[in-house]
């Protein structure tokens, strides 16, 4: 099951393993939405093998319940407290940018691109 978690966690720049009724999962999702993060979520309570996924995550995270478990760039960042610590220290956004997970809106042209692909057209003109 650890192999499945590793595979799922590397399919997108940011993957959140959570549960549909988990408040702290909602907190992380809200933070990422406000930061403009493109993320995927895997709700373990909706997965037929969710208990096995939770056991694998508990071994990786080192606690139970193991959700939310946040992966950025395929690497385990941790649960909510570690995500928030990174955010408060100013280290979360650079990590998200490096993983290609931040989406920014170009207000002049009204489209959305990943932050690492945003072209500054104002400097060209």
Swiss-Prot record:
Pfam families: Glutaredoxin (PF00462). Keywords: Cytoplasm, Disulfide bond, Electron transport, Redox-active center, Transport. The keyword Repressor does not apply. It comes from the Eukaryota. It is found in: Cytoplasm. Residues 2-103 form the Glutaredoxin domain. InterPro entries: GlrX-like_pln_2, Glutaredoxin, Thioredoxin-like_sf. SUPFAM superfamilies: Thioredoxin-like (SSF52833). GO terms for cellular component: cytoplasm. Its main location: cytoplasm. Disulfide bonds join 22-25. Has a glutathione-disulfide oxidoreductase activity in the presence of NADPH and glutathione reductase. Reduces low molecular weight disulfides and proteins. PANTHER family: GLUTAREDOXIN. Belongs to the glutaredoxin family. CC-type subfamily. This is Putative glutaredoxin-C2. It comes from Oryza sativa subsp. japonica (Rice). The gene is GRXC2.
């Amino acid at each position: 099951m650890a192999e499945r978690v590793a595979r799922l966690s590397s399919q997108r720049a940011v993957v959140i393993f959570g549960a549909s009724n988990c408040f702290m999962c909602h907190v992380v999702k809200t933070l990422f939405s406000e930061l403009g993060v493109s993320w995927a979520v895997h709700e373990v309570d909706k997965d037929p093998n969710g208990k096995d996924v939770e056991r694998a995550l508990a071994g990786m995270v080192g606690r139970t319940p193991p959700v939310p478990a946040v992966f950025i760039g395929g690497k385990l960042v941790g649960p909510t407290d570690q995500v928030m610590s990174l955010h408060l220290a100013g280290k979360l956004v650079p990590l998200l940018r490096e993983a290609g997970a931040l989406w920014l809106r170009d207000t002049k042209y009204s489209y959305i691109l990943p932050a690492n692909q945003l072209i500054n057209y104002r400097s060209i003109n």
